[in-house]
Amino acid sequence: ADGSKDPIYLDRFNKKLKKDKTEIVYAERYGVGAGSLDDTLVTHIGNRIFTIIGKIFFDLKLNDILHTFFLCEVKKFKQINFEFKDFSFCVEFPIKAKRNNLSCSYIPTIEKKRYDGVPKVRSFVDGVKILTGMIILFFKR
């Protein structure tokens, strides 16, 4: 963990999960009351592109497909058969959650500046892996 996910949101996740009676609550860095102190221009643009692809091809309602900060019921999470062990998991989880008819809601969050060194993501290389993962998932309906 790089410290960019603020644990202050855990209580909000839990309250939202119970209030909305959903199975997943996603944190979002884009929209009213949200933001990121860790995004670069390249990662921001890439995330916007992948989010749009997710909305168009997978009918996702997320505004932040690559922000893998969420709360999900453990039994529901374990029902999903995950394939990817790289950054493609960021898109695999919401796509497969939707395909498994898991209900979801969202909370705005502020992503903190990481305190543990440099980002592990290699924007172009990992972006290609994520796009490849989305293509595989699209054809594996």
Model-derived regions, located:
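The conserved acidic donor/metal-binding loop of glycosyltransferases
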Residues: 1-4
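Acceptor/aglycone-binding surface of glycosyltransferases and processive sugar-polymer synthases
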Residues: 7-87, 113-135
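Short active-site alpha-helical segment characteristic of glycosyltransferases
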Residues: 9, 89-96
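Catalytic donor-sugar/metal-binding loop of nucleotide-sugar-dependent glycosyltransferases
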Residues: 60-61, 82-85, 94-112
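Functionally engaged cysteine thiol sites
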Residues: 67, 90, 101
